[in-house]
């Protein structure tokens, strides 16, 4: 798993997953609404809602917004119906791309994603085309500028983490989905500040790209994530850190 697309690290280095704070809060609200609708409004008995709330808090989303989203999901407040969809496609160089979308209009979302793939040198594919390349994993992000990365890596593995990846002052800790919350709590108990913790679709294998193709793929992934209806984007590209730095210096 080490050597995957490092997409969480790339987003961290960029400064934020979304260019607009308001757009980020909208996406977080949708996740909370959907989770509350699917599993009920109590975080104690709804792991997905618990994770969505923690992610919103990590992003400094106001507590009033969080409570309102929970009430919309439970039906206590009126709100639009949110549906979840997984869209699959290929980017430049045949890179596999998985898009997690949430919206109140599937046709609009599919149309927007298809347009962005086409514009970015890729194509939207049929269901099942690339999803088999990915598996769901917990990914815990930690800033490591003031930490002993070797010691932290050993701690994480001892706690049950499956793998770690360190790159330019940032560490990603990979866990089985059911273990993520437990490992996060153990790290926090030992004084480690968690930057993010979420379920990501991680590729089982990755592909190396030349610089030109990598730049095209990075742009496509960015543009897809900027769409209002897109929650997360995963790919099986393995980016050279120097190329990523060059891309962001030009973006």
From Swiss-Prot:
The keyword DNA-binding applies. SUPFAM superfamilies: YebC-like. Pfam families: TACO1_YebC_N (PF20772), Transcrip_reg (PF01709). The keyword Transferase does not apply. Keywords: Cytoplasm, DNA-binding, Transcription, Transcription regulation. One of its GO terms (biological process) is regulation of DNA-templated transcription. It comes from the Bacteria. GO terms for molecular function: DNA binding. GO terms for cellular component: cytosol. It is found in: Cytoplasm. Belongs to the TACO1 family. PANTHER family: TRANSCRIPTIONAL REGULATORY PROTEIN YEBC-RELATED, TRANSLATIONAL ACTIVATOR OF CYTOCHROME C OXIDASE 1. This is Probable transcriptional regulatory protein DehaBAV1_0421. It comes from Dehalococcoides mccartyi (strain ATCC BAA-2100 / JCM 16839 / KCTC 5957 / BAV1).
């Amino acid at each position: 798993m080490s050597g995957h697309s490092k997409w969480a690290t790339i987003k961290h280095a960029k400064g934020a997953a979304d260019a607009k704070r308001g757009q980020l809060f909208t996406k977080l609200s949708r996740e909370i609404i959907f989770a509350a609708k699917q599993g009920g409004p109590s975080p104690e008995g709804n792991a997905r809602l618990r994770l969505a709330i923690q992610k919103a808090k990590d992003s400094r989303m106001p507590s009033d917004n969080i409570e309102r989203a929970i009430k919309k999901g439970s039906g206590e407040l009126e709100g639009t119906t949110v549906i979840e969809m997984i869209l699959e496609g290929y980017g430049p160089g045949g890179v596999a791309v998985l898009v997690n979308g949430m919206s109140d209009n599937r046709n609009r979302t599919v149309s927007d994603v298809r347009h962005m793939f086409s514009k970015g040198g890729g194509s939207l594919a049929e269901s099942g085309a690339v999803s088999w390349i990915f598996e769901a994993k917990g990914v815990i992000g930690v800033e490591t500028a003031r930490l002993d990365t070797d010691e932290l890596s050993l701690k994480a593995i001892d706690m049950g983490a499956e793998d770690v990846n360190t790159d330019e002052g940032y560490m990603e800790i990979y866990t089985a989905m059911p273990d993520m919350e437990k490992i996060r709590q153990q790290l926090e108990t030992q004084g480690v500040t968690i930057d993010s913790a979420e379920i990501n679709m991680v590729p089982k294998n990755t592909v190396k790209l030349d610089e030109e193709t990598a730049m095209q793929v990075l742009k496509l992934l960015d543009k897809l994530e900027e769409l209002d209806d897109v929650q997360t984007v995963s790919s099986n590209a393995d980016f050279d850190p120097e190329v990523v730095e060059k891309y962001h210096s030009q973006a």
